[in-house]
Amino acid sequence: MTKKILVWALVIAFLAATMGCAEWNRTQKGAAIGAGAGAAAGGLIGAASGNTAAGLLIGAAVGGVAGAFIGRYMDKQAEEIERDIAGARVERIGEGIKITFDSGILFDVNQADLKYDSQTELAQLSTILNKYADTNIMLAGHTDSTGSAEYNMGLSQRRARTVADYLVAQNVDPIRLDVQGFGEDEPIASNDTAAGRALNRRVEVAIWANDKLKKVAAEKAG
């Protein structure tokens, strides 16, 4: 019970940081979140919210002036992704970026081979990732609850791996990539409706500062 109270207290604090000051820009919010959350809070918030990518981004924040520097770097990258990739839903979380591709954009039903048309969008994403090279990237596959949990886990892993392989083929450094499959374990909508299941079938891309960028940010902060 005490742990649950702590988790939700952290969630409320996070929401206050992101929503309580409407006049803040994304960079300022990122600095505040990083200063107030930290890795432990990020992990707990991710667990409570049921979204590993969001928790990872919150936990990776450094906060303060350095966090604001990283936030500006991410703002520019997020703007380019939103502008150039029509099929991507882009969120700025802390000092990172979460991109969501509905699986229907990338894959046919129950398949892990990329649709031909989706390769254009992933090529554009690769160009931006290569331009902003001082980041780590997690690729997270997700499914709905149709079929067995074991099958869904395997499908989500194969799809995340397929996206990773395509990015590497477009010269994204594989050392930057972490590939994960979560199967049906992290739904973002109800699996009781067709619309909800469609939202749950997705690939998420989490982007956050690597050690090099954090070092530069710390030096800029003095």
Regions inferred by a protein language model and the residue ranges of each:
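Bacterial N-terminal signal peptides that target proteins for export
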Residues: 1-9
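C-terminal motif of bacterial Sec signal peptides marking the signal peptidase cleavage site
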Residues: 16-20
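Short, low-complexity, glycine-enriched hydrophobic/amphipathic alpha-helices that associate
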Residues: 22-80
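Extracytoplasmic/secreted proteins, especially bacterial periplasmic and envelope-associated proteins
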Residues: 31-35, 39, 56, 76, ...
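Acidic/histidine-rich, surface-exposed loop or edge segments in extracytoplasmic proteins
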Residues: 60-64, 101-108
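Amphipathic, membrane-active segments
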Residues: 74-105
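Periplasmic peptidoglycan-binding/anchoring modules of Gram-negative envelope and division proteins
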Residues: 83-84, 107-141, 165-168, 198-200, ...
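Periplasmic OmpA-like peptidoglycan-binding domain that tethers envelope proteins to the cell wall
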Residues: 142-216
